[in-house]
């Protein structure tokens, strides 16, 4: 397995230490090792027992590793980004695809919804109420959708989610850009 949460680490897992606004994952490397981590990855620390990234982002590496670990994904995945309209567009896509006879899903603010021509099933909501799920939740969810024979998925791709590499490792077949306004410009300096 792969995780950025030391509490979720099991035997022979890869632990990726991510530095966030409030926590530094490198402070949890020892706990991850005690829990069975085979390998720990971190940015900018000097420790001969840790694989240190000299360049690049631990967030990016984490998402790419998850994409390899959860390799099964639906055939058609589109990302929808923009200041406004992401939720509406992913919902419209899911509904249109279902009417065309494809088993479809949407992921984002409203949770994960699977739709067939006969019913809608909402079965997951992001633990953190994020528009774009954290990479571990996103990749597990895509793997789960594949196992439920979903062929088409529309994902809300927030600007924060894109910037934080949450969608890396997802094999997107298309993208939609809705619009751009001044929201979030404080984040994207």
Task: Annotate the PLM regions.
Residues 1-64, 68:
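N-terminal leader/targeting and accessory segments in enzymes
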Residues 61-189:
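Phosphate-binding loop of NTP-binding sites
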């Amino acid at each position: 397995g792969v995780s950025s949460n030391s509490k979720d680490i099991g035997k022979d897992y890869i632990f990726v230490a991510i530095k966030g606004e409030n926590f530094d994952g490198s402070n949890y490397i020892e706990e991850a090792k005690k829990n069975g981590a085979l390998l720990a990855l971190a940015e900018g620390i000097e420790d001969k027992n840790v694989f240190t990234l000299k360049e690049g982002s631990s967030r990016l590496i984490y998402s790419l590793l998850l994409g390899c670990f959860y390799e099964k994904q639906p055939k058609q995945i589109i990302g929808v980004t923009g200041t406004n309209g992401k939720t509406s567009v992913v919902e419209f896509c899911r509904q249109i695809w279902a009417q065309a006879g494809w088993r479809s899903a949407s992921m984002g603010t409203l949770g994960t919804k699977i739709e067939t021509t006969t019913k809608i099933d909402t079965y997951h909501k992001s633990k953190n109420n994020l528009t774009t799920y954290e990479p571990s939740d996103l990749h597990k969810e895509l793997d789960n959708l594949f196992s439920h024979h979903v062929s088409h998925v529309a994902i809300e791709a927030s600007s924060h989610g894109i910037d934080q590499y949450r969608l890396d490792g997802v094999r997107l077949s298309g993208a939609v850009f809705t619009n751009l306004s001044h929201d979030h410009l404080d984040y994207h300096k």
